Structures are given as structure tokens and as C-alpha cells.
Amino acid sequence: MKKKYDIKTTDVETLKKWYHLMTLGRALDEKAPSYLLQSLGWSYHAPYAGHDGIQLAIGQVFTLGEDFLFPYYRDMLTVLSAGMTPEEIILNGISKATDPGSGGRHMSNHFAKPEWHIENISSATGTH
């Protein structure tokens, strides 16, 4: 009998990378509200919990130099998975001049890195 499906497995190094990204993203997601409570930045925070798997996948299939990414305010793990650093995400959150997306002018959670074609969008996403 011929097999109907051929299931490929994921190598251990890739699984470790995904685990690292997911735990790092969750740590950032959980830390952001403390900046807000201390009035250190993060004008607001919308956690992405429950969207982890799809956000990781979207970031992993993003091809630098070919694709455009238009993340909305809950897409922290998407941009982390696409290659933005935790430092860049925090700089956005606390509105510092060295934020790569806006030089500290965008609201927090409006992730961007224009040279990578990761573009900022409006808060009114029209997705809900």
C-alpha cells in the first residue's frame, strides 16, 4: 500500500531556535506592563498571548529583501521572529531616539524597521 502522506520532521536545532524565540518573546511580553506601571514607557501594551504559534511562523517565513511585513500592535513575536532584536523592541516601547522604526516618535507596539521592509501601520487595523 502506498503512503498517502510523507511527514517530515523538524531538526533539533530549529526546535531549539523556535523555543528560544518563544520564551524570549514571552519574557518581553510579560515585562512590558512593568515599564507602563512605572511610567518608564510603553504608552500601552496589548499582550499577544495565545497568538504565539502563528506569530512565530509568520516571522520565520518572512524573507528579508523580498517580503514586506506590516505588523500590528500585538505582533511582537512576529517581528522578533523576523529578526528584530529585543533591544529594538524595547527602544520602541520606551520611545527612545534610537528606535529603528521612528526615532522614538511612534506609539509603543508600533514595530517598524523600514530598511527591512517592516513597516508601521495605524492603530486602526480594521481586523476586529
Predicted regions and their residues:
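Charged, compositionally biased N-terminal leader segments and the immediate start
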Residues: 1-15
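Conserved N-terminal diphosphate/IPP-binding helix and adjacent helical/loop segment
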Residues: 5, 9, 25-33
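Cofactor-binding active-site loop characterized by glycine-rich and histidine/acidic residues
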Residues: 30-128
